[in-house]
């Protein structure tokens, strides 16, 4: 059956928590306040939907990579035998059911709040879009198999991560809220840069996979990652320049900006693990800064 730690590793619980929080970020940015009442209930259910969805996605990824991980990552819960494949598949299916069930319950609450439930349809569309991305990322027999197509696979993962913010905004009937859309773009770019660096970091274990780093080489992949970070910098400053956030509140994202710029040194020195870690820190600091900018 595996220990609790084994299941947390299989589900990549840390990433799931990030998705859970991302839904709340979308709601907070949209409301410019903390959600309460029915908005809080909807946001919590959607966050649970994202958590269970991401847990299923991550576990399915390991399930499908079972043979590869027996060689490259024999310490993982599935190839090591600590978690049985059949039990893992049951957990994957259960996670999908919980995700859909949470979405359904949130929809019931939303339906009671409005006379025009069509305004809540984007929430369902975003959930379905994430499902389509998952299926096309993993399946290379019938669908696109983006996982082994290099940059498109990185982009699919990054968009799916960014979508959780729009999911939170859509849950309270405002999927195209300018502040939420800004964070969606910024988060997608941050994640895309980090995904590329992680591919460079994993090149030794990715032999036989068609990742972007394996296609173009480590140096070009690092350069691409840095260029995307520079685009992220522009995306960070744009909503302040456009008045979406108060210009004076740019001080709140300063720690994220400085951390972002510090990544260049690690990329230049080919310190991929450090670069990946700093990008994640920069992204976290930026999210905190944008929340403060929205609440002030």
Kindly label every feature range from the protein language model.
Residues 2-9, 78-176:
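Intramembrane alpha-helical segments
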Residues 49-100, 188-236, 266:
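Solvent-exposed interhelical
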Residues 23-30, 99-107, 134-141, 164-172, ...:
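Structural signal for membrane-spanning alpha-helices in multi-pass inner-membrane proteins
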Residues 9-20, 84-94, 152-159, 219-228, ...:
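Select subsegments of transmembrane alpha-helices in polytopic membrane proteins
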Residues 2-5, 16, 22, 142-145, ...:
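Extended hydrophobic alpha-helices typical of membrane-associated regions
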Residues 16, 47, 93-96, 124-127, ...:
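Residues within membrane-spanning alpha-helices of integral membrane proteins
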Residues 17-64, 96-104, 120-133, 176-197:
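Membrane-embedded alpha-helical segments that form the functional core of polytopic membrane enzymes
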Residues 30-45, 155-203, 219-236:
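Functional transmembrane core segments of multi-pass inner-membrane proteins
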């Amino acid at each position: 059956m595996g220990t609790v730690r084994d299941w947390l590793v299989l589900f990549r619980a840390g990433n799931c928590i990030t998705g859970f929080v991302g839904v709340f970020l979308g709601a907070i940015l949209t409301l410019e306040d903390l959600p309460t009442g029915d908005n809080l209930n909807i946001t919590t259910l959607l966050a649970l939907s994202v958590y269970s969805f991401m847990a299923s996605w991550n576990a399915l990824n390991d399930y499908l990579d079972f043979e590869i991980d027996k060689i490259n990552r024999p310490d993982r819960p599935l190839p090591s035998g600590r978690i049985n494949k059949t039990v893992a598949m049951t957990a994957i299916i259960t996670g999908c059911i919980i995700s859909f069930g949470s979405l359904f319950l949130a929809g019931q609450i939303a339906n009671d709040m409005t006379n025009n439930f069509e305004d809540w349809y984007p929430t369902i569309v975003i959930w379905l879009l994430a499902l389509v991305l998952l299926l096309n990322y993993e399946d290379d027999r019938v669908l696109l198999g983006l996982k082994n197509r290099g940059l498109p696979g990185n982009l699919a993962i990054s968009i799916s991560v960014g979508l959780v913010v729009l999911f939170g905004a859509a849950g309270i009937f405002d999927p195209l809220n300018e502040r939420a859309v800004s964070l969606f773009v910024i988060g997608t770019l941050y994640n895309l840069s980090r995904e590329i660096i992680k591919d460079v970091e994993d090149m030794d274990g990715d032999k036989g996979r068609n990742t972007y780093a394996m296609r173009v080489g480590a140096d070009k992949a690092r350069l691409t990652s840095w260029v995307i970070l520079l685009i992220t910098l522009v995306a960070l400053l744009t909503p302040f320049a456009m008045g979406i956030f108060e210009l004076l509140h740019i001080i709140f994202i300063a720690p994220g900006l400085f951390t972002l710029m510090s990544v260049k040194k690690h990329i230049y020195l080919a310190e991929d693990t450090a670069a990946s870690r700093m990008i994640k820190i920069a992204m976290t600091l930026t999210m905190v800064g944008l929340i403060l900018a929205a609440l002030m």
